[in-house]
Amino acid sequence: MRPTPLSTILALTMAATAPAMAASLKDVAPYPEAEKGFTRQVIHLPAQADEQAYKLEILAGKTLQVDCNRQRLAGSLEEHTLEGWGYNYYRLDKVGGPASTLMACPDGKKTEAFVPVVGEGFLLRYNSKLPVVVYVPDGVQVRYRVWSASQDVQKAKVE
């Protein structure tokens, strides 16, 4: 029996440990196409050593002309299950607003800014093994932020 070259072993090891983000969505599962008036947006997360210490925040929103007030849109991100597979995907059906604070803006200047949708369901479990699939109405952008837990744990006081 011939010894296996080190380069072959290294190549096989790298292929086996490649992140799921290398695969296209169709290679993972038959997620439905976006319905008319919606887009399907996908997030591929890198693997982390301790994924339980991380959360994924979905920031769906629109780029709008805003003044000095704080702007926000309203909506709820709902979790659905891909039948026969058990994989989750998320859907934002309606986006309301915008709503704004009512501060006086003396200069009256407007700038373009990303205005997020605020509501329930936007903080998700971190899972690099599967893509995060989000269906949103046309014109809505999906951005995301990864949160991590601090290693510094505090003790509560008994009072």
Swiss-Prot record:
Subcellular location: Periplasm
Residue(s) at site: Reactive bond: 102-103
Organism: Pseudomonas putida (strain W619)
Entry protein name: Ecotin
Family label: Belongs to the protease inhibitor I11 (ecotin) family.
Bridged cysteine pairs (disulfide): 68-105
One Pfam entry name: Ecotin
Secretion signal span: 1-22
Keywords in alphabetical order: Disulfide bond, Periplasm, Protease inhibitor, Serine protease inhibitor, Signal
GO CC term, one of those recorded: periplasmic space
Subunit structure: Homodimer.
Gene Ontology MF: a single term: serine-type endopeptidase inhibitor activity
InterPro entries: Ecotin_C (IPR027438), Ecotin_sf (IPR036198), Prot_inh_ecotin (IPR005658), Prot_inh_ecotin_gammaproteobac (IPR023084)
Gene designation per UniProt: eco
Protein purpose: General inhibitor of family S1 serine proteases.
